[in-house]
From Swiss-Prot:
Domain of life from the UniProt record: Bacteria
Homology family: Belongs to the TRAFAC class translation factor GTPase superfamily. Classic translation factor GTPase family. EF-G/EF-2 subfamily.
Described function: Catalyzes the GTP-dependent ribosomal translocation step during translation elongation. During this step, the ribosome changes from the pre-translocational (PRE) to the post-translocational (POST) state as the newly formed A-site-bound peptidyl-tRNA and P-site-bound deacylated tRNA move to the P and E sites, respectively. Catalyzes the coordinated movement of the two tRNA molecules, the mRNA and conformational changes in the ribosome.
Biological source species: Bacillus velezensis (strain DSM 23117 / BGSC 10A6 / LMG 26770 / FZB42)
Protein known as: Elongation factor G
Keyword flag Disulfide bond: no
GO biological processes: ribosome disassembly
Subcellular compartments: Cytoplasm
GO molecular function: GTP binding; GTPase activity; translation elongation factor activity
Length: 692
């Protein structure tokens, strides 16, 4: 099947915003106008086309980025809907990674909100060109020019209006297009009919002013245009459009549009702006990768002629077809039924079927081309961030980096019979979401789940109940402590049981020493002359390794120690492996009084990004959490504080940071190293764990 839309006529865009700015409604209207939906679903009634997971419909927020394809004026527009809640930043990160451009939706009443800052920063990191849509112009308190101002003040963005609303709140009637210099009035409720008319008299002066400041702003980015402008020559509409496009593609300029998605006003003009100002796959820099065996850099251009390469950016379990892997094709073509190489994992994969998704309905296609976004059925080993490529021409594309989970919670099924079902459910959910982990705690046998925040784990537990019919009880968040020795000593372990019949006899002398941090447990056999027969040596090592798991102070694993077996004795009849295993564990217990054992806690490397005015409060808060501030720097108009803080003190930090900064602060943290717990705190933990 030949390519339906040329690369130049393809747009891969994301729609990004703060919670409640109207992002899902905007996407919904785009699908309506591009002829994909027959009835419009409202988010507040819980029936939107993109929000297709039940929890999203209940909570009225978008959690998973569904990829949808639409057509407008002979172009193909692939849309990825991204969530706006801070606990789902991984979803935003991964969708930005595969997009070429984005539409940032703002609420006309509030302008730039906290999460807009976070998403905007992420988009800047990935160099994503953006157009801005100031939505909800029909809302009480809507103020377009104030919203444009917040883009400049809070984000230092070179943003300029390319439209002007006619009226506001209930009187919002139409839109003035400053580029074409015409006005659009909406005549029917669906906003499908809007006629271009002359700009009303009372708006002419303001429109003229805004148009000249727009021309001046783009002229600054384009020398030829600047000369024309300074000489007072007329700048034509095509020249102005080309200059806006150039500035937008270079991520130096952000055109701002206006409307009300809910009232069907301005959405078609947003679609026009996507075609006019956002990049085609051929406008963005070619993607770089490395050859798996030699690590030499390879460039893949957006072209059907190049070898196939794609990035898997989302894995989902679908109720009808099983595992769906969403991927973005960067180069080459792929037919369904063919084999590809997952170069990240070194596995061969068969692509069973290829589906193009439309929110929650789907269409099967036989071939995908460079620049396309689609979902594959049948991939067994591919997870988020993996590269899929031609078997004969391997490449690993720059992968996505995901933050480490920051919160651990113990979970158990409400009925014991569901234990296995819960294990399967958690494994499937972990496959979909790289920031969600699941493990079994060897000391307590509990299942521990880890994620990006409380809402994140709530949703996981919720999905388990809905999709896998497993109900669970969730515990309070916990910290993974460790133990180690600070000094060395020679210790004896003797196990003797000789009372009639076959006895038990095992006797060892072991020298314990602290090992380097991160070196783990090392065992050395220094027996000479067979005082402990060779066949019992592995039993001594096994006995030590088993006992290390449960520590000596408070039942946490003992790490980073050396053990040298140097002497002992045996009995011809009564000695056996079991006896030496027990003797070794007794030696470890006896080491407690001589080797100065201490408790270690995970120390997190924390990075907090906040507006300058909250600097003092945040520094004080970090210090009160036993944190050490390691450094500070300015990033745009925000301040970054880097610190080392014990994980035990970081519980509830997301909530505290939100309230300390009115939701404008964000933070990331990951495990850095283990450090000794201060004595007074260690005593408390030991008491608690021994049940005293």
């Amino acid at each position: 099947m030949a390519r339906e839309f040329s690369l130049e006529k393809t747009r891969n865009i994301g729609i990004m915003a703060h919670i409640d700015a109207g992002k899902t409604t905007t996407t919904e209207r785009i699908l309506f106008y591009t002829g994909r939906i027959h009835k419009i679903g409202e988010t507040h009634e819980g029936a939107s086309q993109m929000d297709w997971m039940e929890q999203e419909q209940e909570r009225g927020i978008t959690i998973t980025s569904a990829a949808t394809t639409a057509q407008w004026k002979g172009y193909r527009v692939n849309i990825i809907d991204t969530p706006g809640h801070v606990d789902f930043t991984v979803e935003v990160e991964r969708s930005l990674r595969v997009l070429d451009g984005a539409v940032a939706v703002l609420d006309a009443q509030s302008g730039v909100e906290p999460q807009t800052e976070t998403v905007w920063r992420q988009a800047t990191t990935y160099g994503v060109p953006r157009v801005v849509f100031v939505n909800k112009m029909d809302k009480i308190g809507a103020d377009f020019l104030y919203s444009v101002g917040t883009l400049r003040d809070r984000l230092q963005a070179n943003a300029h209006a390319i439209q002007l609303p006619i009226g506001a709140e209930d009187n919002f009637e139409g839109i003035i297009d400053l580029v074409e210099n015409v006005a659009y009035f909406y005549e029917d409720d669906l906003g499908t009919r809007s006629d271009a008319k002359e700009i009303p008299e009372e708006y002419k002066e303001q429109a003229e002013e805004l148009r000249s400041s727009l021309i001046e702003a783009v002229a600054e980015l384009d020398e030829e245009l600047m000369e024309k402008y300074l000489e007072g020559e007329e700048i034509t509409i095509p020249e102005l459009k080309a200059a806006i496009r150039k500035g937008t593609l270079n991520v130096e300029f952000y055109p701002v549009l206006v409307g009300s998605a809910f009232k069907n006003k301005g959405v078609q003009l947003v679609l026009d702006a996507v075609l006019d100002y956002l990049p085609a796959p051929t406008d963005v820099a070619a993607i770089k990768g490395v050859r798996p065996d030699t690590d030499e850099e390879i460039v893949r251009h957006s072209s059907d002629e190049e070898p196939f390469s794609a990035l898997a950016f989302k894995v989902m379990t679908d109720p009808y077809v099983g595992k769906l892997t969403f991927f973005r094709v960067y180069s080459g073509t792929l037919d369904s039924g063919s084999y590809v190489k997952n170069s990240t994992k070194g596995k061969r994969e068969r692509v069973g079927r290829i589906l193009q998704m439309h929110a929650n309905s789907r269409e099967e296609i036989s071939t995908v081309y460079a620049g396309d976004i689609a979902a594959a059925v049948g991939l067994k080993d591919t997870s988020t961030g993996d590269t899929l490529c031609d078997e004969k021409d391997l490449v690993i594309l720059e992968s996505m980096e995901f933050p480490e989970p920051v919160i651990d919670v113990a979970i158990e099924p409400k009925s014991k019979a569901d234990q296995d079902k819960m294990g399967i459910a958690l494994a499937k959910l972990a496959e979909e979401d790289p920031t969600f982990r699941t493990q079994t705690n060897p000391e307590t046998g509990q299942t521990i789940i880890s994620g990006m925040g409380e809402l994140h784990l709530d949703i996981i537990v919720d999905r388990m109940k809905r999709e896998f019919k497993v109900e669970a009880n969730v515990g309070a968040p916990q910290v993974a402590y460790r133990e180690t020795f600070r000094t060395g000593a020679k210790v004896e372990g003797k196990f003797v049981r000789q009372s009639g019949g076959r006895g038990q006899f095992g006797h060892v002398w072991i020298e314990f020493e602290p090992n380097e941090e991160g070196a783990g447990f090392e065992f050395e056999n220094a027996i000479v002359g067979g005082v402990v027969p060779r066949e019992y040596i592995p039993a001594v090592q096994a006995g030590l390794e088993d006992s290390l798991e449960n520590g000596v102070l408070a039942g946490f694993p003992l790490i980073d120690i050396k053990a040298k077996l140097f002497d002992g004795s045996y009995h011809d009849v009564d000695s056996n492996e079991m006896a030496f295993k027990v003797a070794a564990s007794m030696a470890l217990k006896n080491a407690v009084s001589k080797c100065n054992p201490v408790l270690l806690e995970p120390i997190m490397k924390v990075e907090v990004v906040i507006p300058e005015e909250y600097m003092g409060d945040i520094m004080g808060d970090v210090t009160s959490r036993r944190g050490r501030v390691e450094g500070m720097e300015a990033r745009g108009n925000a301040q970054v504080v880097r610190a080392m803080v014990p994980l035990a003190e970081m519980f509830g930090y997301a909530t505290a940071l939100r309230s300390n900064t009115q939701g404008r602060g964000t933070f990331t943290m990951f495990m850095d190293h283990y450090e000794e717990v201060p004595k007074s705190i260690a005593e408390e933990i030991i008491k608690k764990n021994k049940g005293e």
